[in-house]
Amino acid sequence: MAKPYRIVNQTATTPPKAKSEPFWKFRNLAEGDEKAELLLYGDIAERSWWDDTATPKRFADDLAALGDVKEITVYINSGGGDVFAAQAIGNMLERNSATVIAHIDGLCASAATIVACHADKVVAAADASYMVHPPSMGVCDYLTAEDMRNCLKALDTIRGNIVALYAKKTGKSEDECGTWMDETNWWTAAQAKENGFVDEVDDEESDTVVENRNGMLFVNSIGMGLPFDKAPDFVKSRMGAKTPGGFSNATNNPGQTGTQEEEAMEIINKDDL
């Protein structure tokens, strides 16, 4: 009997949002401007992606409701999330007739990089961070040897799909992109540009705020699901370096309350805690 599983690519798992809240937010700009924005802050596709309020179809409907816009800017500040959801979002945006610009405001890590790589252009704030790392597997059930072999096959397939996307975006070989992923790499915006993941670095004054809240990494008041000590030094060194106009802090990440439901098996991409 096949085992149910969920594949995610993120720094760590977080509790799901309330069912009434999708994890994305669209908005049209001024009437006649023919531009729209998509906000992807926090985890991409938590478990709420699969309930009746936040589904791939709802995302497609929200995207279609924008109408005939010429440009969509996707603002990203995310530690990752569900691989299949990130692929669905990325492919829907890529198929859209509008020019899609991904703008990395703070952190673009793990599955969030999948969405960014589907954009026509990737712009990063000068003090933004980019991170790639390999998927890992968390098993929460009794599995036979055949079950485990099937899990490994699925994991290898997902890794291969992501590596191929990276190679397409960067123009690098799949071997080089695979090595980057397997080693786990954190890059500054400039380094991500040098490696081909970012097309342009925005040198204007940035609002990025890095915080250590009870030992966890927060970027622009959004929890990244990663222990602060796991972040590289160039990220930790930005703590408290808030510029005018930065985001205000909140006690908790909105919507991140509740109990994480149990899954029989997960394939995840996270740092060892």
For each predicted feature, which ranges?
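N-terminal organellar transit peptides
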Residues: M1-A111, A119-L273
